[in-house]
Amino acid sequence: PSSAASDVYKRQIMRRVQDAMPEREGIKALDIGAGPGFFSIILGMAGCEVTALDRNPAMMAEAKKNAGPLAEAIHYVEGDAEDVPLPMGSYDLIVTRNLTWTLPHPKKAYASWQRVLKKGGILLNFDANWYNYLYSEEDRALYDRDREQVAEAGVFDRYISTDVMACERIARQMPLSPKKRPAWDRQVLEEMGMQVTLYENISEEILLPEEQLNFAATPYFCIEAKK
């Protein structure tokens, strides 16, 4: 990750960890859907004891490469985010980013994450209402406005530069695409007995101005859930 992005997320995560667990030391952290290791590296730099979980072995190899010297201190586990193959009550902190919306069984995933958290541990889930515009005329209008404003500003369009139709086909198969989030997540987590705090728009805190323009209609949120 870039130095600027790492610093921003590190501050976001560690501030909330300190608020939720002010007296806890030696934080055991689990990065679920670790991908290329963005969060794993940040957590390692922050002094956490880190486990990185991903189902893709090629991505695990990339994460190790990206971590450099930190890789020796990170425990890499190949496994399913919906059925985490780790002991019950073993982590103080779980972090995940841009993952939940892609899961076929998000309720199952949340239950699995709760299982591996220690009592008093916290989940920090960074995500957004990706592709909700497929199910809402109002959101579609806001999405179209974003594309116009990005073009007018002459900045790189992060949607048009991708295979939008392919991404939309995938999104239509995902159960969370039509849901209003993070309200949906709050309800599910509270029904499981978690204490939930929502930060419904943190885009200004974690995105560059160009990114904020691209995703104005789809702000990043953070779900903090304490066991």
Which residues make up each language-model segment?
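Single conserved hydrophobic/aromatic residue that forms the stacking wall/gate
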Residues: P1-A5, Y9
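Class I SAM-dependent methyltransferase SAM/SAH-binding core
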Residues: L30-I32, P36-D83
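A short acidic, Gly/Pro-enriched loop at the edge of an enzyme's catalytic core
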Residues: E82-L93
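A short SAM/SAH-binding and catalytic strip from SAM-dependent methyltransferases
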Residues: L93-P106
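A short glycine-rich, Lys/Arg-flanked "PGG" loop and its adjoining helix->strand segment in the class I
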Residues: K107-K119
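Conserved class I S-adenosyl-L-methionine
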Residues: I122-F156
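Short alpha-helix
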Residues: L176-G193, L198-Y199
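Core SAM-dependent methyltransferase catalytic element
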Residues: P209-K227
